[in-house]
Curated annotation (Swiss-Prot):
Protein name: Larval cuticle protein LCP-17
Gene Ontology molecular function terms on file: structural constituent of chitin-based larval cuticle
Role this protein plays: Component of the cuticle of the larva of Bombyx mori.
Positions of disulphide bridges: none
Organism listed in the record: Bombyx mori
Signal sequence bounds: 1-16
Key words, A-Z: Cuticle, Signal
GO cellular component annotations of the record: chitin-based extracellular matrix
UniProt gene name: LCP17
Amino acid sequence: MKFLIVLAVAVACASADVSHIAKSDEYAAPVVKSSYDITPEGHFQFNYETGNGIYAQAEGAVKNVNSEYPAIEVKGAYKYTSPDGQPIDLAYVADENGYQPQGSHLPTPHPIPEAIARALAYIEAHPPSPSVVERKVVANLLG
């Protein structure tokens, strides 16, 4: 019985239609230009360009080297054409504040409704007094 199952699986694999799986030249794109520069101080810079129109570049350095919390700051960009034909052009900064991409293809947040913006401005202009906040915290702790 096990032999028949193994034989059936082997026959199914051998006769599977794989003609729809097409190999693309995208995977074999030649590198047209490439440069890398790394210094002992922690600075780096690189860029490359491929034959199918992909381009990327970045540069970075260690900030606050002698502090307790050194951080790496990287600025870069890349561009390519998406499979649906849309040109993708993205610039980014990555530092202690996180990854911050910018590009016309990225979604943008909806504008803040006017009523919410007014409420936020009012709260900022009229902060609660510290005694009110302290009383509420103590009341919550006591129960």
